[in-house]
Amino acid sequence: MNRPGNELLRQMVSSHLFGTPCGASRFFLVFLSLLCISTSSIADDTVVVRVSNSDFRTAHDGLIEAIESEGLVIGSILPFRDMLARTAVGDGALPYGEAEIVQFCSALLAAELVREAPAQLTLCPLSIALYTQVENTSEIRLAYRSPGNSTAGRQRAESLLQRIVQRAAELARLRW
């Protein structure tokens, strides 16, 4: 028996209003799926290149040379492993044999990026990490955070970082 009061109650249930199961609105389900998609893409923005048959000092020198050969000036070199050792939070076990971050910027690229969108100033300076892990100090890793390719400036930044890392890896393997 279908009463008028029951019909009104059924119409007020969100699964009836929005046509989705379990009372979840379509908006909520779309929002949840977009959140999951954006979270997984955040984890994939680090690019790592491994270099074998070299040593940290040679790879460091190769990275400096690769940056300077692009006509760029290094802003700073951050001794990341040393900073972690000094602050020794937790059990004190460090994952790095050696680790540093080299920061640099291209004035032309920075100008292009901020013309595209003022908030893109957060992409400067660019940085490349150079490190070894405790369990394998003979393998040097070069890593950077990809700026993505959503604008022409970001594409140029990505291309610049790729060129620098590839050139640094080549120089490190040469042990020049």
Q: What kind of feature is each model-predicted range?
A:
Residues I42-G71, S76-L78, E170, L174:
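Terminal, regulation- and interaction-focused segments at domain boundaries
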Residues C105-R156:
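Surface-exposed, polar helix/loop patches in the mature regions of secreted/periplasmic/lumenal proteins
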Residues S38-S40:
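N-terminal signal peptide c-region/cleavage motif recognized by signal peptidases
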Residues A43, L78, P95-Y96, Q133-N136:
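Short, ordered beta-strand-loop transition motifs
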